[in-house]
């Protein structure tokens, strides 16, 4: 997120067979970088090349991300950790309107990952206090939720199996929804064949 980002991305694309990239906005940032002049050519190139923009954002960044998603409808955006809703960001189910603008963008997907990162400090797997959050993500992003292990970082909070079971057992998905979340959707986004 420094000047010359588009040139660095172009050089990386010339060197490697990239499928996407990740960037992390800090809690202190307002999200303006996502829609600023420096980022515009960067995201335009990412859209042109079919990359997945994997973004770690906080709930207060979602309006800017919605603007980005509408400006670049061919850009797949993958948001980390349930959009960081939950006790860590001091958001509750009453903050649901923060997600509405981004949920209406069909090119935005959400990783059902990092529940230990968004949960309260005294909460433990299976994080029953986050039931509202899992339900909200499935409802607002139908067919656009994917599992992510967040491994090895998640090992501070859960085992690898627990990170899977958070989706398989504790997220209100249909059988087809679980299959999609556990690999089918990502395979489609990456252009991989299934089977």
Indicate residue ranges for each PLM-predicted region.
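Active-site mouth loops of central-metabolism enzymes
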Residues: 1-3, 27-33
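Short, acidic/polar
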Residues: 2-13, 94-95
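Catalytic pocket-lining loop regions of alpha/beta-barrel enzymes
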Residues: 19, 33-146
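Conserved, mostly hydrophobic/aromatic
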Residues: 21, 46, 110, 150, ...
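Mid-to-C-terminal alpha-helical segments outside catalytic/metal-binding sites
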Residues: 136-146, 155-195
């Amino acid at each position: 997120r420094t000047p010359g980002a588009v040139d660095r991305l172009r050089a990386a694309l010339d060197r490697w067979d990239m499928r996407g990239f990740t960037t992390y906005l800090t809690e202190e940032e307002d999200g303006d970088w996502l829609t600023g002049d420096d980022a515009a050519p960067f995201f335009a190139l990412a859209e042109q090349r079919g990359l997945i923009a994997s973004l770690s954002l906080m709930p207060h960044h979602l309006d800017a991300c919605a603007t980005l998603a509408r400006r670049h409808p061919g850009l797949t955006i993958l948001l980390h950790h349930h959009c960081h809703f939950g006790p860590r960001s001091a958001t509750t189910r009453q903050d649901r309107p923060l997600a509405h603008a981004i949920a209406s963008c069909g090119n935005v997907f959400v990783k059902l990952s990092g529940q230990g990162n968004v949960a309260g400090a005294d909460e433990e797997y299976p994080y029953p206090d986050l039931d509202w959050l899992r339900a909200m993500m499935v409802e607002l992003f139908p067919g656009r939720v994917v599992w992510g292990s967040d491994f090895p970082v998640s090992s501070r909070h859960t085992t690898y199996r627990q990170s899977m079971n958070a989706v398989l057992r504790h997220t209100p998905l249909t059988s087809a929804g679980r299959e999609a979340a556990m690999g089918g959707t990502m395979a489609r986004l990456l252009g991989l064949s299934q089977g």
